[in-house]
Each structure stands twice: as structure tokens, then as C-alpha cells.
Amino acid sequence: MIDGDGYRLNVGIVICNNHGQVFWAKRYGQHSWQFPQGGIDEGETPEQAMFRELYEEVGLTKKDVKIIATSRHWLRYKLPKRLVRWDSKPVCIGQKQKWFLLRLECDESRINMQRGKSPEFDGWRWVSYWYPVRQVVSFKRDVYRRAMKEFASLAMPFRERKTKGKRKKQRR
């Protein structure tokens, strides 16, 4: 769905593990990496779209994750002019995204990027929380920064919950 301003309605997905790391996926056949994301179909809620995309792109289901947070606002980015398909109607000039922070509740061996009709990703890894903001393609960087900033206080405690009650040396 494309809104009246030319933005495709979309969801972005940040998956955290219990170590405060985030799931980072390599685009199929490319050298670029990103979070899972995808369009919202007609009649679908953002949450329904998120679970559909999560399964299609990562192979995970509702029971494999827990929703920790949803972005308060829609976050938008414009596509570079060279990526706009001017001959499509309506013309899509960018993405308008609702972001979800999920915690992985299953073993990571359940991740399977081959479940969708045409795989979006061909590799993945866990990275430090802020790594994606520095590494994502430049036109998505501000949206990533805003989503990650909004979720930071909720994502970081995953690490502390595992070690609660144990003294841990501070790393510097």
C-alpha cells in the first residue's frame, strides 16, 4: 500500500537476543546488510504484516519471539532518485515504517531464511546493538538511528536479566 504522499507502508523488525545483540541480515546476492522489513498488504495491520514478514524472511513464527515494543510513530525515509520506479502507478518515493522490537524466545537454529517464495537474505549474524546504524545504506540511516534510539532502553536490559544477581566485571 502506498499512502497519499507516495510512501509505501512498511514494517521494520529488530530482533534482539539475551546478550543485547541484534539480528543483522545480508541481502540475497549482495554485499549489503539490513534488518528484516516488508510491505503492509491491503487489510493487514502492522503487527500482522510483521509476523508475515518475519516468517517469510527469517522463518520465525509468533511463538519464537516476544514483542517488546512498537515504534510510537511512523518513521519515513526517501529513496534515492535512482531507485524510484517512475513508471509505476502510484509512484513510490520511499518507505513509511512502523518498527517492532522483538526478543528471540527460541533457539537460533530455528532461523531459516529459505521459507519464503523468494529469499530476501542469504546470511545473518548477531551484531552489537548500535552496529546497524553505522553500517546500513545511507538513505536508511536516520530511520535506523531513530528506531534504535527509541528501543535502546528496552533492548539493553536483555543482557542484565541473564546475569541478575551475579557481579560482573565492567569492561572499558
UniProtKB/Swiss-Prot annotation:
Keywords, A to Z, come to: Hydrolase
What this protein is called in its record is RNA pyrophosphohydrolase
Q: Which GO terms describe its molecular function?
A: mRNA 5'-diphosphatase activity
Q: Sorted alphabetically, which SUPFAM superfamilies does this protein's record hold? A: Nudix
Q: What class of enzyme is it?
A: hydrolase
Matching NCBIfam families, A to Z?
PRK00714.1-1, PRK00714.1-3, PRK00714.1-4, PRK00714.1-5
List required co-factors. Answer: a divalent metal cation
Motif position, Nudix box: 38-59
For the keyword Translocase, the answer is no
The GO annotation for biological process reads: mRNA catabolic process
Q: Which GO terms describe its cellular component?
A: cytoplasm
Native source species: Vibrio campbellii (strain ATCC BAA-1116)
Extract the InterPro entries matched here. Nudix_hydrolase, NUDIX_hydrolase-like_dom_sf, NUDIX_hydrolase_CS, NUDIX_hydrolase_dom, RppH
Q: Which residues form the Nudix hydrolase domain?
A: 6-149
Q: Where is the signal peptide?
A: none
Q: To which protein family does this belong?
A: Belongs to the Nudix hydrolase family. RppH subfamily.
According to its UniProt entry, what is the function of this protein? Accelerates the degradation of transcripts by removing pyrophosphate from the 5'-end of triphosphorylated RNA, leading to a more labile monophosphorylated state that can stimulate subsequent ribonuclease cleavage.
Q: What is its EC number?
A: 3.6.1.-
Record has Manganese as a keyword: no
